[in-house]
A protein has these predicted regions:
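Acidic/polar, glycine-enriched structural segments that form the non-catalytic walls/loops
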Residues: 1-100, 181-183
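Extended hydrophobic/Leu-rich segments
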Residues: 2-7, 17, 162, 215, ...
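Active-site-adjacent structural elements in folded domains
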Residues: 87, 91-100, 150-155, 213-218, ...
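C-terminal ends of transmembrane alpha-helices
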Residues: 77, 81-82, 200-211, 223-231
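Aromatic-rich carbohydrate-recognition surfaces in CAZymes
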Residues: 25, 32, 36, 101-208, ...
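Generic secondary-structure boundary/loop-capping signal
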Residues: 82, 140, 144, 158, ...
Length: 240
């Protein structure tokens, strides 16, 4: 059986809906399945960037399988229109019965784009930085905690500095792979604004300046900045 999901059916009349269903029913399902299969086999071959192991052991077979499945996974995470990259695939559209990772955290996406580069998915990496990051950067240079992959701001519960720092790091890591100076120039203004924000943010945390910005009040509620230097060096990744 084939089940059809009718999306936004309130925007078409019933007759038009049935015409669409009839057109779908006329399609050769086996031919469509074969076409899809050929597409993804070709896709995997195009992105294999290592010499796969000879499958003479269970370990090697498993290694090759995981590698190929990883290639198939990444397109499911990526929004082709915006370049946004979700942290994980979610099947629960309401995000109530799941891990709630179907969002784009800039920090997480940066590390995923590093995997993109290792799989010859450089275009996907560049779209993330050139389109998604540019469109979601705040006026003060920061990136918020998380977004929907279409670029809309998602619910947040607190600022995490590595969301911003990670993007600057990721831009340079991608440049080291491609050596594309034009990409670096395109990213320069965005990264300069991000670094300026990071300097202000850290000055506030360390108590080096009294000038307040949009995150200072939140920082002061969390940290005793005057005793900051006396605290042991211990932090979680998202507090970097």
């Amino acid at each position: 059986d084939i089940y059809l999901y009718i999306f936004e059916n309130d925007k078409v009349n019933v007759e038009e809906m049935w015409k669409n269903i009839e057109n779908i029913r006329k399609q050769d399902v086996e031919a469509e399945q074969s076409s899809v299969q050929k597409y993804w086999i070709k896709y995997v071959k195009e992105h294999i960037n290592i010499e796969l192991k000879e499958e003479n052991s269970d370990y090697n077979k498993k290694f090759n399988q995981i590698y190929k499945r990883s290639i198939l996974l990444f397109p499911l995470l990526t929004n082709k229109e915006t370049g946004g990259v979700a942290a994980a695939v979610e099947v629960d559209e309401n995000l109530t019965q799941c891990g709630r990772y179907g969002y784009c955290w800039p920090r997480d996406a940066v590390f995923i784009t590093r995997a993109f580069d290792k799989l010859k998915m450089n275009k996907e990496t560049e779209k993330f930085y050139k389109v998604f990051c540019k469109n979601t950067q705040s006026r003060n240079g920061m990136w918020e905690q998380r977004f929907y992959t279409d670029g809309r701001l998602a619910p947040c519960w607190g600022y995490q500095i590595d969301e911003t720092a990670g993007v600057v790091y990721g831009v340079y890591e991608h440049y080291k792979v491609t050596k594309d100076k034009k990409f670096l120039k395109d990213m320069l203004k965005m990264c300069e604004n991000a670094v300026k924000f990071l300097c202000i943010y850290m000055d506030n945390i360390l108590g080096l300046h009294d000038d307040s910005d949009i995150v200072k009040n939140e920082i002061e509620k969390t940290y005793h900045t005057e005793n900051r230097n006396k605290l042991p060096v211990s932090y979680d990744l998202w507090e970097m």
